[in-house]
């Protein structure tokens, strides 16, 4: 369960940061037809309660694609996050365009500008988005409960809940599992605390 949770949370976090940073950079620093419409469509998806799309998504993933009890069913629906795109777009709007223009003058490609200039400058915001995404999927419960039925494919939170039924509420293993599930989050926060606090103040006015 711990390994499953680590795989799912890590892959989803890396994917959302990768796609979110590219989309955020394009929406913040690039001018192209329909940019504002795309951004407002993105915002509108954040207003839709997840319960509205849950049943169609479940039918698509488990019945149409046959991804029940697989890593694909746990990972693919969360590969892109509109919240991450929105947050990174807002953070990248504060980055000075002069640095990117200077890199282009020095014959840097657009990929080089994104990789060597934008990502290092946006590291605090990326850290915050990464922490929120990782924690959210580390503690995810409802979707893994729906798409997994085999014990070998369960995630940590679903596995802990199953102690009530499979082991007649074994409080000892449950408490031990709860502590184990909390430890990685605590370690990650203290390891990235400096970037996390910087990211929370992105866009703030400094006197």
Task: Describe each region flagged by the PLM.
Residues 1-207:
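A structural signal for multi-pass alpha-helical bundles of membrane permease subunits
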């Amino acid at each position: 369960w711990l390994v499953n949770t680590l795989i799912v949370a890590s892959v989803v976090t890396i994917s959302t940061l990768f796609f979110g940073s590219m989309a955020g950079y394009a929406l913040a620093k690039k001018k192209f037809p329909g940019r504002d419409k795309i951004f407002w469509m993105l915002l509108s998806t954040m207003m839709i309660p997840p319960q509205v799309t849950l049943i169609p998504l479940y039918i698509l993933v488990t019945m149409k694609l046959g991804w029940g009890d697989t890593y694909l069913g746990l990972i693919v629906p969360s590969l892109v996050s509109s919240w991450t795109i929105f947050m990174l777009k807002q953070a990248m709007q504060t980055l000075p365009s002069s640095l990117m223009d200077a890199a282009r003058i020095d014959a840097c490609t657009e990929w080089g500008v994104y990789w060597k200039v934008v990502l290092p400058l946006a590291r605090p915001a990326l850290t915050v988005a990464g922490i929120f995404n990782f924690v959210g999927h580390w503690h995810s419960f409802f979707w893994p409960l729906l798409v997994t039925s085999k014990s070998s494919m369960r995630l940590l939170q679903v596995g802990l809940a199953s102690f009530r039924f499979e082991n007649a509420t074994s409080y000892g293993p449950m408490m031990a599992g709860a502590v184990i599930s909390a430890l990685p989050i605590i370690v990650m926060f203290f390891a990235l605390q400096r970037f996390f606090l910087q990211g929370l103040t992105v866009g703030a006015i400094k006197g």
